[in-house]
Amino acid sequence: MAEEKQLFSTEISGKKFTVEVGELAKQANGACMIHYGDTSVLSVATASSEPKDLPFFPLTVNYEERLYAVGKIPGGFIKREGRPSEKAILSSRLIDRPIRPLFPDGFRNEVQVISTVMSVDQDCPSEIAAMIGSSIALSVSDIPFEQPIAGVNVGRVDGEFIINPTIEQEAKSDIELTVAGTKDAINMVEAGANEVPEDIMLEAIMFGHEEIKRLVAFQEELVKACGQDKFDVVLAESEEELVENVHSEAKDKIVNAIQVQEKHARDEAIKQAKNEIVAHYEEQEVEEDVIKQVKSILDSMVKEEVRRLITKEKIRPDGRKVDEIRPLSSRIHVLPRTHGSGLFTRGQTQALSVCTLGALGDVQILDGLDLEESKRFMHHYNFPQYSVGETGPIRGPGRREIGHGALGERALEKVIPDDKEFPYTIRLVSEVLESNGSTSQASICASTLAMMDAGVPIKAPVAGIAMGLVKSGDDYTILTDIQGMEDALGDMDFKVAGTANGVTALQMDIKIDGLSRDILEEALSQAKKGRMQILDSMLATIKEPKEELSEFAPKILTMAIEPDKIRDVIGPSGKQINQIIDETGVKIDIEQDGSIFISSTDNEMNKKAKQIIEDLVREVEVGQIYLGKVKRIEKFGAFVELFKGKDGLVHISELAEERTNKVEDVVSIDDQIMVKVKEIDRQGRVNLSRKAVIQDEKKAKEQAK
């Protein structure tokens, strides 16, 4: 890399995009500073000098958020950034997915790519700057990275596609798409959409690719100017003679084992076939390195045979046709005391989702770099080890769980009613009980069932399906509803979720260089057929959301007051609102516009709290008659509470028509009496009269005669 700082500039959507190379982090293999508008991201790539003895490529990608980037100091006692936010984890995955396929097969050096967000302009997405920065850091380094990639966000406002839409444009857009790829093809898609047809989603992807081509060309010029020569790669390879021997000895056994249709029986058959071959070589007392090579060759054979059977003979491991979905079943109200639950089973993949309804005060508070401060709809995904019949430590959610949860959330959020129509916080938890591929899509289906069981008035039911691809040269086969083996050994995992009307979420990961438009179009079309079949199965279980909420769900009353009356409800230091909560046991959430949401499982207490609040904000009207309660007696009169928080004085001369010597001669504490409002003085004091009410009653009787 050049020792002196070099600057390279272009534009993205009219905003300046500048790359600095050669000044910062010079001890790393490659580094660059990206300035996109006022967004600044430092991307750095490093690699170990020697390969690791691992059966996989050890790549780590981190997207690091610094709260100083938006002028915030972290909360808590420590005042440091803690664990990564959900946005940071999802952005790390977003960058990892398009760059991972572009390292040489068999490359085992440890590679770490870190992008640190140092300044944020909300209209210039930091994750896009980090993705392009990661590609540049790898491309200018000596790490063997095959070719640059770029990524963009795509929105659609009033039918027009937009690259990297602003915050204002995002609010109006019916598509939230992130697409990445090389100059030749797409290799990563992440999208949420408002029931958008497949053909429009495809056009959005291809629209994004046109901008990607330009940004890759920009990077290629940059690499010519300051890129380094790549270091020699030591690839994990096996001896040719050994490969031939293992193939001849194991092929028939491997082919037969692969075609055992039941997952566990197939896994056991493959394991037994491998063990027999390994045992044969161990009997010959060969070196440990040879045994490792034999195991690697056998793993490759399984992959090659699965792929050959699919592409050449159109035979899937479990015997299905390429567009066939595994057996489907579903049911609702699985758990009696939860607010809603749904169980969805597709072959040997099973998810149980639970819907919990809460008050609007139960929203998730977000503390990150985005403008969004809270979230009222959440989907969480859990993947225990028992779902694949294994043991293992129980830890908090990892990147995969967070990513799958976010995908389900994105797929479902477009059908969630707004808080005016349905003033609840909604939390979905999906428990994966069995896993043989496509668990994230099963969680979407189960979550739809759970919400319908809970009585959430969703706009339309959502189903999801995972598509696969096996490509060999120009031959390719697209698979519907891929299982675990097809996902692990295939070239693509393309998840599509949506309603009968259109797509609500897409996620595509591939292990090859990229996909053409024709393959994407065919995959989307095939996915739609599968989605419709799954929706039909789900609707046979429950056709529409239940009309009544669960008896165990909180009941919510809504009301509206004038914003300047909010202080009357809250009271000094929250005294008034806490008194209402203590008296009724409800939860009260107040919005700045005067909207009030009262929630509890007891509707009578909700009504009581509402009445108290109505009394607090009620205005006393001169000339009106009220039934009040005597609260305090003085020599000069009685203080009467008209309603909660409002009282007035009945002067001793206004208690009765005749002269009153002592207030106690007419009224006592806690007496209920009818009083008329005579006046409200300049200080807001209310003067009442019992005598006026008596006189009015006499007049009314005389007029009635």
Swiss-Prot record:
Superkingdom assignment: Bacteria
EC nos: 2.7.7.8
Pfam families for the chain: KH_1 (PF00013), PNPase (PF03726), RNase_PH (PF01138), RNase_PH_C (PF03725), S1 (PF00575)
Cofactor: Mg(2+)
InterPro entries: ExoRNase_PH_dom1 (IPR001247), ExoRNase_PH_dom2 (IPR015847), ExoRNase_PH_dom2_sf (IPR036345), KH_dom (IPR004087), KH_dom_type_1 (IPR004088), KH_dom_type_1_sf (IPR036612), NA-bd_OB-fold (IPR012340), PNPase (IPR012162)
CDD domains given in the database record: KH-I_PNPase (cd02393), RNase_PH_PNPase_1 (cd11363), RNase_PH_PNPase_2 (cd11364), S1_PNPase (cd04472)
Family indicated by similarity: Belongs to the polyribonucleotide nucleotidyltransferase family.
HAMAP family cross-referenced by the UniProt entry: PNPase
Protein name: Polyribonucleotide nucleotidyltransferase
